[in-house]
Amino acid sequence: MNITTIPNNCTHMVVKMTKNFDSAYMFYLLAKKIAEDDSLNPVIIPALISDSTHEAIEARVTGRVVEYMKAAFPNVNIDDTHQVRYDNTVDKNRSLRDSLVEQHQNSGVDMAQGWLSTIPDDSIVVMYNGDCEPLTDENFDAMEAHFGRSHDHIRALKGRPRINEMPWKSKGTTFPIYHSFINENMTRLEVYGEMKELGLNSLIDNTISCSMGDAEATNNYTQPCGVCYYCDEKAWIKLQHA
């Protein structure tokens, strides 16, 4: 996939990071584009969106990805990770989609204002969200049949609303958020395939695809649980690209 929506006057590029490989690939594509285009010279700001209960493992994964990018693209200006936390307070009796959207929007907007207030008002900021939609219905069905588990709570997230701009409160304006993979209807099945073709296996290995839901009960945040949607999705995707 080619990233083309980078304004030439962009000074600060925010990359929304999670512990999954799709956000790492978005980071890679942006850094590669900047490294190859002399007209672009923004600072890349990795912005980790983390559940407060999983913060340690997510920060560790993001740290590995940032180190990978700095080594791969030494001439690209990559800042330290900026953290946005939200509390894992999803009420199971509410719509999961509504709860998650509310958490991410409210916490993300409020906490982003801290670092936005530290950069000059004449900065040109853009943000890139590397999230993908869940698998297509056909592939979702095949994955569930393969593992014998249903993940209806993730199906409910398909097509959820996305924030397309971020308010910059201290400046009284907004800046755009690009959802490049979602706009191209890419799922992690296609992202994984592109990463393999580019030989980015070690980058994939630096990420973790897991909701870490079981980690709260076991107090083990060091390895995937093996039973959540994201674990099943990655295992099924690997089989498709074997």
Q: Where are these predicted regions, by residue range?
A:
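Nucleotide-activated chemistry modules centered on ATP-dependent adenylation/adenylyltransferase
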Residues: 1-242
